[in-house]
Amino acid sequence: MKDCANDFDFCTPTRVLFGKDKINELPKVLGAFGKKVLLVYGGGSIKKNGIYTKIQELLKDFDLFELSGVEPNPRVSSVRAGAKICKEQNIDVVLAVGGGSVLDCSKIICDAAFYDGDAWDLVIDGSKITKALPLVSILTLAATGSEFDCAAVISNPDTNEKIGILNPLNFPKVSILDPSYTLTVNKKHTAAGCADIMSHIFEQYMVDG
């Protein structure tokens, strides 16, 4: 095991807006990138906790498109679907609302929006990523740290692969963190998120590279 007192160099270019009701800054944040927005979310919890309705109200002057149903351990099929919308609708910015899976999927959607081939190519060979749409996130579950890193993990059931990728183009431009959005998360998933946070911290000292 490495010496846990090792020096390190830490940098994240993501702007973090932390606090209650920071979502109210969303129109200004997204407006800096354009008016066509792709909203990406998972199983629909944002409709139960009111975030979805709030976003609709705030973005009434925007052209809002949606990709819902992003899976835990997001699949490349969801990435493909999102990239298709981005290309067909000339999306300016992607808004990811959810936990790490939604954010990971959204990162590769941003990459694939400028790629003519299959999105899976970008996962297995990050050098093919040359440009990405701007990504803004609203976090609803504290766990992986995907809201301010450049990592993404995507699954491909057809090849039975689950691959992680790191690319500096995948840093979210802005992440909105309102702790009140995590209050509806049940005890089981809150505990799992805490374990996830700790494991990601510990692995930095145990894994080379």
Predicted regions and their residues:
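ATP/NTP phosphate-donor binding region
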Residues: 1-93
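Hydrophobic/aromatic beta-strand patches that form the interior of the parallel beta-sheet core
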Residues: 65, 95, 134-138, 174-177, ...
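A gly/ser-rich beta-alpha-beta helix-loop segment of oxidoreductase catalytic cores
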Residues: 135-160
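Carboxylate- and glycine-rich phosphate/diphosphate-binding segment that chelates Mg2+/Mn2+
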Residues: 151-209
